[in-house]
């Protein structure tokens, strides 16, 4: 496959968005893989890799406690897409890769991976913030109930109202 124009910028942006280790695995020759890896700035690369080698690499990374995202577009990527914590297929890729992947990126542009990571980060931030609020608010309601400041019906009403408000805000 030819090198995508946006590959280097996408790798840099993914690293800036919090991806700590970026690995390229390809069936291409060592010489070709090394040249591409240097140009795009990945942390590690593996050449002349078979489909089962990709899946085995992912299993080893997961066994080491890492969360693994696999991006692929071909039939040969299917076992690895399935093995990863999150498999991402490129829309112009093989149909089986799109079926196996957890997410299919609609545009044939690696920058979409950066957008996906930014959306993911924003959603997780919102979930954590909402969780902290609900726990703190409910602990306050329990404390007020135990202290006799709030009646049980008032506490239940406030609890349900806060849950509804957080749900609507989300």
Model-derived features: positions:
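Membrane-embedded alpha-helical bundles of multi-pass transporters
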Residues: 18-19, 40, 76-77, 82-86, ...
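Cytosolic catalytic headpiece
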Residues: 1-76, 80-86, 118-121
